């Protein structure tokens, strides 16, 4: 149930009846303060201006046409023309009852779309580091949300699996007589990569051999393709362990690396030339874009093929967007890539649109994100100043969580303790990131993320177990509870019910904007409202069975909402803490 959408429709009809144009925006929003009701319609200002009348006068006319019987208990005009809507307790009770009868908690399904989500994108022959964390977990939260809403989601892990580095790696492996790459751990590959790069920079004969190997690899030579495949396999096997630890839904089947688009690049360049979009400039093939200016104020040149015939990331990204529309039949494409790549993507997509590869009706969206910083406000590094490996970060999270939960649960079995530490430790790392607006940088702080107070994973996981504890203490007749009516008579019951019923609205925002922090804020709010409700509205010691059962049902919907909401974020819940 999307109450905001229902009210928007009703207010819009009333505005049109009051003389507003058919495309008027009612601007119905969740109210920021209790005294302004549950929702507020703010659209009178803009429409009144167009009609040449006072906003309050328009609001008064709208009210004469607004029928919210059975939905609102009170509707009032505030200030210059805001319309405050207070929901009817009986309406809230009915919607809570309906939500409890559905596994989806009453969340409706939008028109199904095919949505491609590009996220994670590690590089072959390198271990994942903290720089991969944000794309991986924010992208996965978007995927989970879109799938829950009923969309057909295609995960696209745009792995860096092509380029000159493979000539270096294969040449170095061969030099070391270690062609049997399948037996190597990825940590070895990291060392091999460093050594290969050193030799490439210092030994011209080695560099020449590496360049020849790239040519052979690109021409499809069987031996070199096999060596390349081994490197990819080792990397993705290791990455899968990290994905599984992070409770991320990516699998090997989702890999759509740069190599996938390689065969398409000559055709792309030829087509852009034929369409008059690409021209020769100083030996390279370039697309000049009026939409982007260089320092001199001239159209910026975007190279799509170098003098030596090599292609660039832009060329690959053009082919990639074309493939996602033509072959994957995407209705929408989301890219979870850091903010530093924004101009690069905008240039590639401008070319894509000009060439007619993807129509304007199919959105290409850069859901960019900021950086993870250390407490000093600089990019997060090891003490020695090196890049933090993701596996090491997760190991430390687990170790810290182990100490934390062991302290609080001295009698818990070793198995239970390990499960709980894993849920808390990994959950803390993910939630600390997901709860921040993705567009900003954020400070990575162990103490904050593992705290049991505030908007953290441990607090949210504890809040969930606290609701469950009510049911453990109660001697509940499941059948009697299922058939019991919901009664909303106290303010705190109404506030909790109204917020619980905004779950669909929250999911809709996350799906549209790709902002999981909105879900985190919502769940934190629900947990806080339940805490106030629990304190002021006795459940197990309620004045009679009818009130007790009704409050148990509110607790039941709270538990289900917290669990489902955390699941869309990829955060595990636990039964005990």
Swiss-Prot record:
Keyword ATP-binding: yes
GO biological process, one term: arginyl-tRNA aminoacylation
CDD domains: Anticodon_Ia_Arg (cd07956), ArgRS_core (cd00671)
Xref: PROSITE patterns: AA_TRNA_LIGASE_I
Subcellular location: Cytoplasm
Catalysed reactions, semicolon-separated: tRNA(Arg) + L-arginine + ATP = L-arginyl-tRNA(Arg) + AMP + diphosphate
Keywords, sorted A to Z: Aminoacyl-tRNA synthetase, ATP-binding, Cytoplasm, Ligase, Nucleotide-binding, Protein biosynthesis
Disulfide partners: none
Gene Ontology MF: a single term: ATP binding
EC number: 6.1.1.19
Motif 'HIGH' region: chain residues: 122-132
Domain of life: Bacteria
GO cellular component terms listed in the entry, alphabetical order: cytoplasm
Sequence similarity: Belongs to the class-I aminoacyl-tRNA synthetase family.
Subunit details: Monomer.
UniProt-recorded name of the protein: Arginine--tRNA ligase
Organism this protein belongs to: Salmonella enteritidis PT4 (strain P125109)
Primary gene name: argS
